[in-house]
Amino acid sequence: MTDYKATLNLPETAFPMKAGLPQREPETLRHWNSIGLYRKLRQIGEGRQKFILHDGPPYANGNIHIGHAVNKILKDMIVRSKTLAGFDAPYVPGWDCHGLPIEHKVETTFGKNQPADLTRERCRAYAAEQVEGQKADFIRLGVLGDWENPYKTMDFANEAGEIRALAKMVEGGFVFKGLKPVNWCFDCGSALAEAEVEYQDKKSDAIDVFFPVGDADKLAAAFGLAQLDKPAGIVIWTTTPWTIPANQALNVHPDFIYALVDCGDRLLLLAEELVEGCLARYGLRGQVLATAKGEALELIRFRHPFYERFSPVYLADYVGLDAGTGIVHSAPAYGEDDFRSCKRYGMSNDEILSPVQSNGVYVESLPFFGGQFIWKANPNIVAKLAEVGCLLKHETISHSYMHCWRHKTPLIYRATAQWFVGMDSKAKDGTTLRERALAAIEQTRFVPAWGQARLHGMIAGRPDWCISRQRNWGVPIPFFLHKESGELHPRTVELMEEVARRVEQKGIEAWFRLDPAELLGAEADQYDKIADTLDVWFDSGTTHWHVMRGSHPMGHDQGPRADLYLEGSDQHRGWFHSSLLTGAAIDGHAPYRGLLTHGFTVDENGRKMSKSLGNVIAPQEITDSMGADILRLWVSATDYSGEMAVSKQILQRSADAYRRIRNTARFLLANLSGFDPAKDLLAAEDMLALDRWAVDRALLLQREVEEAFDSYRFWVVYQKVHNFCVQELGGFYLDIIKDRQYTCAADSVARRSCQSAMYHIGEALVRWIAPILAFTAEEIWQYLPGERNESVMLNTWYQGFAELPDGFALDRAFWEQVMAVKAAVNKELENRRNAKAIGGNLQAEVVLFAEPALAGRLALLGDELRFVLITSAAQVQPLGAAPADAVDTEVAGLRIQVSKSVHTKCARCWHHREDVGLDPAHPEICGRCVENIQGEGEVRQYA
């Protein structure tokens, strides 16, 4: 028996079937490093339109988690796809390096009593160490960026730039000093930004407190009574008993109706709508004596329950009827609404009582409770109220309450003297920061679109921004305040520039070690040098200033604005927010043109990642066991607009999809063995119809892929490319061309035609997957035939396609119909195989009974229809000629009959043909194979 294997064009490639990503990816990283890929991209990008994705800096503390990986991979997919689209898309990674978590870590290690300058030195060293660890992990993910020169907010140039940004805002009239209630953490010993507050359930003491009337005659008159015959008082409800010692007013709504209720031994003032519920809660019976609108109660005084002072009634629109009594007790030092209400009635800062110190302990001079921690004082205050007969009800409730995001401990509002960025104070051009920011939001593209309403609502309702902190490790607020007037030095902006120049040389230590006389000369004795540092959200929120036009100028031809900021959905109140405010203050517009938001990672059951639940998946584990490309493929396949579910099972599905894409690429490479595009590539008009369709289909897909990348819908790219590999290629085209590829003469038009198509598809496919499967695309690139440069990323989208011309008989619609017919035939072939009626498909002969229009189209393929259906014979007959045993199909106007071939199997092509053995020199093979071996070769036109 002759061995015809040597006469076949069998696939051959060194491209490995087994990916071995954990071992092979580090080799690719070394390749990128050795060729200086990032530098080369900047060189070839000169003169191109820029696309700037500005990196929101992760905090330099701890290992990266899966959320960090998602964020960086999304950014990398955008930067890579924009590069392939012909943009110059630099990516400068950054880190947020100042702030309390690092300071807390250093204090935990070295103690709290070390000198401030040593604390800062150790914080800087710790942050630098953390940056290096995170950097290695990000690089391992395949993220392409300027890793040799990232930005760090603690770099001297950035610290100086931040001071200059603050100076711009001072110059614009946005910065002021004020006493206001701010979020305060006792454990931090500092004010917190809104983004540092999280809400958890907390058990609290809920109390109803009686304030005896001080102006009895006025109260009687307000209710139209001649006099009060019994002791009377107003009732408040609160969940913060610790604020009662600081009570200074009582708030009612001007439009609500209030009732004076006779309860036997005394009269209670309550909102009329809540009387029934309150009396039931107190276990009392009562009768309404009279009613009055809230506005009639204005300025009537009531006595504090246990201190010798009065609390007047103020009118306030924020009072509600959803809980309590309809009257709100007001402690202006400990509530934003309380503070605003009391200030509106003329209370000066000096008159505001603030007995709680920064550590949560009452001042020693406070009667009854001095020296007590407020949470521990709560039961003592409740007991005191009961003792003086002013406690009507006490119960414990569970409610959502603000906590520190670091310490997980309850926060309070606390009025302290702080530096603020004013939201509503008029700037020098007559606009407010709030107006500027809201206008900027309207000019910003949001992905997903709902982000616009979310950020708009936050800006519209937010208070002034407290930017000062009482910590060591932070960029200083370099102000000098006059000792008598408390005013800023008249040359503040000029002095800040001098400080910035010094910080540029020696870092923030230049300010902390500065002798004021060096800058102020003889004036130094008249001024205090303040010690406050800036909120870390100001650090990151001004990177558009101190990075994009400072340490790493982006040279954007459309001004100092990023095209895109991309972060998690929590950054609407974080980095997106602070950047918007500083950009609007300094430049009058947002520092970004677009905002992309991604959701948080959860497990397959929708639960948050938690060590206690055991569902945490570290990105390092994935890269070590499966490879970064599997993680990248999962990110691309997931709709990031909502929660992103990840688990080992989900990642395994991504690995399965990866194998299908890799196997498709390997098939293309193996069948391009010996193909030199410089001399073997056929012009489109010389290619077979099926091959022209395959190239045209790839062209259409590329247009869809480009559009999906441009709109950041990576899951669409994944779905379309994966489906193309599995369905159009694996399930149709590549299956059909195997016969022609393997059995036709090596240099025949028939074979070179399908190789030309596979070459075009391979050149395109490697680019489509490059933003997603960064490592695998680079590996494929090295194996593709023809001369090529050092990296797939040094190229743009493939341009070598030829579109099917108009009027082409075997057009797109034709091949769509053929695919449907082939699917119907495959279904019946499978049924016949399962019934043991045939062995393989090539043992089958098929007759297609088709309605005239379909029959006419299928007839265009002539004898080559059998190659498309991958059967040994195929005929087309009229639908009316179909016998009773012909099978109906899902294709309208088509019935099928499959029979087992009676002919001998060709030992070379495996087709069952009547001419096998007719050539005495080749008794085991068919006439077609004889022609392909020793003749001029068969001629194919279509498939």
Curated annotation (Swiss-Prot):
Transmembrane regions listed in the UniProt entry:
none
Q: What is its EC number?
A: 6.1.1.5
How this chain assembles, per its entry, is: Monomer.
Q: Where is this motif: 'KMSKS' region?
A: 608-612
Q: What are the binding positions for ATP in this chain?
A: K611
Q: Where is the short sequence motif 'HIGH' region located?
A: 58-68
What is the protein named? Isoleucine--tRNA ligase
Give its localization: Cytoplasm
Q: What is its main location?
A: cytoplasm
What is said about the domains? IleRS has two distinct active sites: one for aminoacylation and one for editing. The misactivated valine is translocated from the active site to the editing site, which sterically excludes the correctly activated isoleucine. The single editing site contains two valyl binding pockets, one specific for each substrate (Val-AMP or Val-tRNA(Ile)).
Q: Pfam families from the entry? A: Anticodon_1 (PF08264), tRNA-synt_1 (PF00133), zf-FPG_IleRS (PF06827)
Query: Which InterPro entries does the UniProt record give?
Result: aa-tRNA-synth_I_CS, aa-tRNA-synth_Ia, Anticodon_Ile_BEm, Ile-tRNA-ligase, Ile-tRNA-ligase_type1, Ile-tRNA_ligase, M/V/L/I-tRNA-synth_anticd-bd, Rossmann-like_a/b/a_fold
Q: Which GO terms describe its biological process?
A: isoleucyl-tRNA aminoacylation
Binding annotation for Zn(2+): C906, C909, C926, C929
Against SUPFAM superfamilies, the record matches this protein to: Anticodon-binding domain of a subclass of class I aminoacyl-tRNA synthetases, Nucleotidylyl transferase, ValRS/IleRS/LeuRS editing domain
Catalyses which reaction(s): tRNA(Ile) + L-isoleucine + ATP = L-isoleucyl-tRNA(Ile) + AMP + diphosphate
Q: To which protein family does this belong?
A: Belongs to the class-I aminoacyl-tRNA synthetase family. IleS type 1 subfamily.
- Gene encoding this polypeptide? ileS
Q: Which residues bind L-isoleucyl-5'-AMP?
A: E567
Q: Which PANTHER family match?
A: ISOLEUCINE--TRNA LIGASE, MITOCHONDRIAL, SOLEUCYL-TRNA SYNTHETASE
Its domain of life reads Bacteria
* Keyword Cell inner membrane annotated: no
The protein's required cofactor(s) are namely: Zn(2+)
Q: Which residue spans adopt a coiled-coil conformation according to this UniProt entry?
A: none
List GO terms (cellular component aspect). Answer: cytosol
